[in-house]
A protein has these predicted regions:
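Basic helix-extension-helix modules of the SAP/HeH family
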Residues: 1-53
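Short, Lys/Arg-rich amphipathic segments at extreme N-termini
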Residues: 10-15, 63-103
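SAM-dependent nucleic-acid methyltransferase catalytic core
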Residues: 58-80, 86, 131-240, 244-250, ...
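SAM cofactor-binding core of SAM-dependent methyltransferases
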Residues: 86, 93-157
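Short active-site oxyanion
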Residues: 91-94, 112-113, 215-219, 270-276
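Short, polar loop motifs at secondary-structure junctions
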Residues: 99-104, 206-207, 280-284
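Short loop/helix-cap segments at secondary-structure boundaries that form the rim of catalytic
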Residues: 106-111, 212, 231-234, 286-292
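Long, positively charged, glycine-interspersed low-complexity recognition regions
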Residues: 258-325
Length: 325
């Protein structure tokens, strides 16, 4: 609207409609200045309101897309979310997961603001590469690399790793082709799981842009759990904890996690301001560590396929649901 073409009387009428006061009736320039200022304020307010509505819409849309883990991970919780989902806070600022692993709850929740971390550098390179929009490079590698025993051991033992992309490519290939998706390293830090003998492997998730969208808006770190507790200690944040279980096996090849680490984690869990939800295997030691924080437990039955094709005996365990809020 060009105010200069209006008469003083018309401008005064506009001022009255907009409830503008403090002008001189005979000073046309003063009235025009006031009207322009009000218009600018109104436009800024409208832009802000549109932005806020858009942000709320994005969050709602994001949370309706439940993704599945990209890779297999020992102890993954994809089939168990139904047992503890109702304990998750309805509102929080940042989703935190310091033992991301396969990230079952993270991908399922599809949070708008998240920080995920793990001390496993190959895993972090994989998530980072996908978040950077380079999943097509991993897809090409999968297409060009045969799923056979000779190639598997060549990739596992001889592939030259000189950057995060080649690291991610090898890691993803191994996760898809190794026996039972297991993760184990020898004393020299070399991956030592045998070939899986799968007739077909599915890597189409790499073409799903929803993974890239989620990971691109996530801060992806290769840090210890202590670092996450220390740097995101806010009561408005939510942390999901799926740590290594309390067992005789404590050396994962890429990290050590025994009784000492479990005790350190429990101490941080009890002292932090962060709303923490943990799911972990039930043992006497864990029960004692978290005796005042256990809110639920459920049964989990495992049955593993053996390397010769036979199916092993069913293993019955219990998982504890623990929270500090």
């Amino acid at each position: 609207m060009d105010y200069k073409e209006k008469t003083c009387k018309e401008l005064i009428t506009l001022c009255k409609q907009l409830n503008i006061k403090g002008y001189t009736k005979k000073n046309k320039n003063e009235i025009i200045t006031l009207l322009q200022e009000v218009k600018e304020v109104k436009e800024v307010k409208e832009v802000k309101e549109v932005k806020e509505v858009k942000e709320v819409k994005e969050v709602k849309e994001a949370n309706t897309i439940h993704l599945k883990p990209i890779i297999k991970w020992s102890g993954g919780k994809a089939d168990e979310i139904k047992y503890f989902e109702h304990h998750i806070p309805s509102n929080y600022n940042i989703y935190l997961e310091p033992f991301i692993g396969g990230g079952a709850l993270y991908f399922y929740s599809n949070p708008k603001n998240a920080v995920i971390s793990d001390v496993h550098s190959e895993l972090i390179d994989l998530y980072s590469i996908i978040g950077q929009g380079k999943s097509n490079e991993i897809y090409k590698f999968m297409e060009q690399t045969p799923n056979n025993e000779e190639m598997y051991y060549n990739v596992r033992d001889n592939m030259v790793i000189n950057n995060p992309l080649t690291n991610a490519q090898r890691f993803y290939y191994q996760r898809k082709t190794c026996f039972r998706g297991m993760l184990r390293y020898n004393k020299n830090g070399k991956f030592n799981i045998p070939f899986g003998r799968y007739k077909t492997i599915n890597y189409e998730a790499l073409n799903n842009k929803d993974y890239e969208t989620l990971l691109s808006r996530t801060q992806i770190l290769c840090k210890s759990f202590e670092y996450i507790f220390e740097n995101y200690n806010d009561e408005n944040n939510f942390m999901f904890l799926d740590p290594p279980y309390d067992s005789e096996f404590t050396d994962y090849g890429y990290c050590q996690f025994g009784k000492k680490e479990q005790e350190k984690l429990a101490k941080l869990f009890k002292e932090t301001k962060i709303k923490c939800l943990m799911v972990i295997g039930k043992t006497t030691f864990i029960q004692e560590l978290y005796k005042d924080y256990i809110v639920d437990e459920y049964d989990k039955n495992y049955r593993f396929k053996l390397y010769d094709g036979r199916v092993g005996d069913e293993i019955n365990t219990k998982h504890l649901v623990i929270k500090n809020y």
